[in-house]
């Protein structure tokens, strides 16, 4: 009789402490503690994030194991985010994973955070509509720290076709939200306001970058200069037009993302297209995916909202596949704040 494989996944790359347990690749539990402390600072404060991870990691892991209905001694391996991310945050998860695995005498599995996002569609949470994309497929990975188009041939065979040469789409949204005085994180706020606004009300600069690479620094600069000019003319401009501003900003960013993705589909002839990362929760981007599916015959794969942001389930599913291939890491494996994709 084949022994069941239980993987504990741990994610701590930024400001979410998360732990998940998977049994034979099926998700049993996924527990996440988010950090509201950063909101008043307008962004993640690394030192505060690290301290919060230290407070949260033990109870979060214990709760994940409890909800999974197993004993820790049943675990087969511990998978953890090795990078990229904030070094102080990563070290908390990395060191806990090492100590926990060593105490149980089980293997360690290091996981690239970006690889985890790419594999989010392979998280089987027991849903009736579980439908992972067939290989190969294209994945738009878009978050606060990354904007990439990835060709996925297998969990351990991915090719970056294009990526941002400066700022990420999620970072641009957060910075523009801050300029408007809307608070942090900006993504959900811009998304909510955009649903009530006119996406063609204002025009912002779009980059002209060859190939499949992205750039969002010019958009941020254009947005800032326009806001300054309009506020000088009318101090209440943002308050009176925030819905239209948000809708126009969202439309511009989505348009930039989709133009490059459409080009990638044309170049590769791959029409199975997925989206992942925190920005994939954006309503405008999701609508654009459905629209392109109808217009161009794509088959699109959009993750559950709970799998769009940082979570340990995505680390656990990569860990499961690596366990099957016996791809374990050494106890001395360091964390990396910056790391190549795979």
Which residues does each predicted region cover?
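Glycine-rich phosphate-binding/hydrolytic loop that grips phosphoryl groups
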Residues: 117-119, 303-342
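Glycine-rich phosphate-binding loop plus the immediately following alpha-helix
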Residues: 115, 153-198, 221, 225-229
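A contiguous, well-structured pocket-lining segment that forms one wall/lid of small-molecule binding clefts
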Residues: 192-273, 282-296, 323-326
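Short Gly/Thr/Asp-enriched flexible loops that form oxyanion-binding sites at enzyme active sites
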Residues: 80-105, 123-124, 283-292
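Conserved phosphate-binding/catalytic loops in two-lobed NTP-binding clefts
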Residues: 110-111, 243, 273, 290-315
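N-terminal beta-alpha supersecondary unit
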Residues: 4-84, 113
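Conserved phosphate-binding catalytic cores of ATP/NTP-utilizing and phosphoryl-transfer enzymes
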Residues: 1-3, 111-137, 318
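Short beta-strand scaffold segments in enzyme catalytic cores
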Residues: 17-22, 139, 147-151
């Amino acid at each position: 009789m084949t022994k069941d494989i239980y993987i504990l996944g741990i994610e701590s790359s930024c400001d979410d402490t998360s732990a998940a347990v998977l049994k034979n690749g099926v998700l049993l539990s996924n527990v996440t503690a988010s950090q509201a402390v950063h909101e008043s600072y307008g962004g993640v404060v690394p030192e505060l994030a690290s301290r919060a991870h230290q407070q949260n990691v033990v109870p979060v892991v214990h709760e994940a194991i409890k909800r999974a209905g197993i004993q820790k001694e049943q675990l087969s391996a511990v998978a953890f985010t090795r990078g990229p991310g904030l070094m102080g945050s990563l070290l908390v998860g990395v060191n806990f994973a090492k100590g926990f695995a060593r105490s149980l005498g089980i293997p360690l599995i290091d996981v690239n955070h970006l690889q985890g996002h790419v594999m989010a569609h392979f998280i089987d949470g027991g849903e009736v509509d579980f439908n992972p994309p067939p290989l190969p497929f294209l994945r738009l990975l878009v978050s606060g720290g990354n904007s990439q188009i990835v060709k996925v041939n297998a969990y351990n065979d991915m090719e970056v076709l294009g990526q941002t040469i400066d700022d990420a789409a999620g970072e641009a949204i957060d910075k523009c939200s801050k300029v408007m005085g809307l608070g942090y994180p900006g993504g959900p706020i811009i998304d909510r306001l955009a649903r009530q606004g006119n996406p063609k009300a204002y025009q912002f600069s779009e980059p002209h970058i060859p190939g499949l690479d992205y750039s969002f620094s010019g958009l941020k600069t254009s947005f800032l200069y326009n806001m300054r000019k309009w506020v000088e003319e009318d101090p209440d401009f943002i308050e009176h037009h925030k819905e239209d501003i948000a809708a126009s900003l969202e439309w511009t960013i989505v348009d930039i993302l989709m133009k490059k993705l459409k080009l990638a589909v044309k170049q590769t002839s791959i029409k199975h297209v997925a989206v992942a990362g925190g920005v994939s929760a954006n309503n405008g981007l999701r609508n654009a995916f459905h629209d392109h599916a109808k217009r161009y015959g794509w088959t699109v794969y959009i993750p559950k909202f709970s799998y769009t942001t940082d979570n340990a389930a995505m680390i656990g599913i990569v860990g499961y596949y690596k366990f099957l291939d016996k791809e374990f890491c050494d106890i001395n494996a360091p964390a990396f704040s910056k790391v190549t994709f795979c």
